[in-house]
A protein has these predicted regions:
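Conserved AMP-binding/adenylate-forming core of the ANL superfamily
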Residues: 7, 12, 16, 24-69, ...
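Conserved pre-ATP/AMP-binding loop-to-beta segment of ANL
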Residues: 23, 135, 154-159, 166-188, ...
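Conserved AMP-binding A3 loop
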Residues: 36-39, 184-208
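Structural core segment of the AMP-binding/adenylate-forming
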Residues: 53-54, 81-163, 485-487, 494, ...
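Adenylate-forming
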Residues: 67, 112-121, 229, 256-260, ...
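AMP-binding/adenylate-forming catalytic core of the ANL superfamily
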Residues: 93-96, 110-112, 273, 391, ...
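Conserved AMP-binding/adenylation subdomain of ANL enzymes
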Residues: 207-224, 232-272, 286-287
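Conserved AMP-binding/adenylate-forming
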Residues: 248, 266, 305-323, 327-428, ...
Length: 544
């Protein structure tokens, strides 16, 4: 293919263009700190030169362990500009878990926030592959954190971010790549079923998914995007690249709390944010919550939002975009595309339609619900099968794991492990993870369906349902519920309410009203933690 009619796709071109088109426009806001697009590009080039000067060669992995700071946003461009591959690590992991990722990825350089330096140092302690530890002092955080960053250290590989960048000047770097299928990032899965797997993203996939985020989340040059979604989670659904591509403004946020989010919403005129439903719930129940003076588009994924949550968001002034995907699909892969006729429906009916996972996004290549023989299930909204995907934004594979890659890609499709149905209108609806489905007396019970029935109760803030052993039925559903602040109800009342929504055999016999539910850093409820507790409790009862 001739070079005149072909250019390798890379998100690097987004910042190169925006720095030319909007050089004086504010690109990044963090506390008192501001970066124009021209300054943003200059800091990216400086960091890329520092990485190269530290020995980063094409394809080398560079790990970042930090919250949503400007430095992590810069890294999404600087690391690939230097020819490296970005490995953004979950900040909630233990040193042992971080070490597993550093060891598997073979990261040469680790860049860490000062507050996470002890974790980074412990994790890198026995790894000779790590040649440099760079610590970032967050000047907008507490002075203690900043002082911690610049104090003396026995670790010879340690250097401050300021020292790391010092004196890095030279000729302009090329904002291009030789091959669009080269890796741009490796994102590690949660590892709830074993060791985390490294999911490879390419320049091409990141480029196309970024354009899809612009289209489906309705971004333009007036977008003010609040960073409530961790950048370490699927590279923030490619929003570092998407918002930059369209010339929007990034508002960085160190800690995701309801009050802090409302402050940013009002202070900076935020127009967009991405969040899991649990984060959305925290926003809605924050003490500063109130009607918005301008619409804010919330793109949400994770656990399917309940119709009750969607209706409440709309009343507050949030415009909901519901998407679905996995780490292996660069984050969002489907969108619940609104239809004009939905607007005239009652709120509860419209919300129920919007809670579905929808149709393939514009960049995708295929979306199916299949049975064990890879045949499409009937589009009847009832027959469950596994959701399978293929196309431009499915991962290149699992890093250094050809067997897991082959298993995930069997039959020429990516197997999600999620169970769902296909509706007659072509929209899919997630019913459960394959491991979360409850099989009671031979009947499949969708825990999501039970959770949504519970969430429709006015006192219920959050709900999680798992399967627990039952001598008669094999399994039965058990619910864990967090009530809304200032409300009260009884288990009997909750069960009676659920029976008005779903069949009696699906209604949990056991409902625990609790203070909080275990969650991941992105706000997803960790059902495996609940299952482990129940398993331990059941084993103790049997032994006792």
């Amino acid at each position: 293919m001739g070079s005149v009619s072909y250019t390798a796709m890379t998100p690097l071109s987004f910042l190169e263009r925006s720095a030319r088109v909007w050089p004086g426009k504010v690109a990044v806001i963090y506390g008192r700190r501001r970066l124009t697009y021209s300054e943003f590009a200059a800091e990216v080039e400086q960091a890329a030169r520092a990485l190269r000067a530290s020995g980063v060669q094409p394809g080398d992995r560079v790990a970042y362990l930090m919250p949503n700071l400007p430095e992590l946003l810069i890294a999404h461009f600087a690391v690939p500009l230097a020819g490296g591959v970005l490995v953004a690590i979950n900040t909630r992991l233990t040193a042992h878990e971080v070490a597993q990722i550093l060891r598997h990825s073979g990261a040469r350089i680790v860049v860490a926030d000062a507050s996470l330096l002890p974790t980074a140092m412990t994790a890198a302690g026995g790894l000779d592959a790590v040649t440099r530890l760079v610590v970032v002092a967050d000047t907008e955080a507490s002075s203690a954190r900043a002082e911690q960053a610049v104090g003396p250290a026995a670790e010879p590989r340690l250097v401050s971010y300021r020292e790391f960048l010092a004196g890095q000047a030279g000729d302009p770097l090329p904002w291009s790549v030789p091959d669009e299928l080269d890796p741009i990032a490796i994102n590690y899965t949660s590892g709830t079923t074993g060791l985390p797997k490294g999911v490879i993203y390419t320049h091409r996939g990141a480029y196309l998914n970024s354009l899809a985020q612009i289209i489906h989340s309705r971004h333009d040059e007036n977008s003010v995007y609040l960073w409530t979604l961790p950048m370490f989670h699927c590279n923030g659904w490619c929003a570092p690249w998407a918002v930059t591509a369209i010339g929007g403004t990034h508002v960085c946020l160190r800690e995701v709390r309801g009050e802090a989010i409302w402050q940013q919403l009002r202070e900076h005129g935020v127009t967009h944010l991405n969040a899991a439903p649990t984060v959305v719930s925290a926003i809605l129940t924050a003490s500063q919550a109130g009607p918005l003076t301008r619409p804010v588009t919330v793109t949400t994924a994770g656990a399917p939002p309940s119709p009750t949550t969607i209706a409440e968001m709309e009343r507050t002034g949030f415009k909901v975009v519901h998407v679905y995907g996995l780490t292996e699909t660069y984050g969002p892969f489907t969108v619940c595309q609104p239809q004009p006729q939905w607007a005239g429906l009652p709120a509860d009916q419209r919300a129920a339609l919007q809670a579905r996972q929808g149709v393939g996004m514009i960049q995708t290549g295929g979306l199916r619900v299949v049975d064990s023989a890879m045949a499409d299930v009937p589009a009847d909204g009832e027959t469950m099968g596994e959701i399978a995907m293929r196309g431009n934004t499915v991962m290149a594979g699992y890093y250094l794991d050809p067997e897991a890659t082959a298993a995930a890609f069997r039959g020429g499709w990516f197997h999600s492990g999620d169970l769902g149905v296909m509706h007659p209108d072509g929209y899919i609806e997630l019913r459960d993870r394959a491991k979360d489905i409850v099989i009671s007396g031979g009947e499949n019970i969708s825990t999501i369906e039970v959770e949504q029935a519970l969430m429709s109760h006015p006192c219920v803030f959050e709900a999680a349902v798992i399967g627990v052993p039952d001598d008669k039925w094999g399994e039965r559903p058990k619910a864990f519920v967090v009530l809304r602040p200032g409300t009260s109800t009884t288990v009997k009342d909750l069960a009676a309410h659920v029976r008005t929504r779903i069949a009696g055999y699906k209604t949990p016999r056991d409902i625990d009203i609790t203070v909080k539910l275990p969650k991941t850093s992105t706000g997803k409820i960790q059902k495996y933690v609940l299952r482990e507790k129940e398993r331990s409790s059941h084993a103790h009862q049997v032994q006792g």
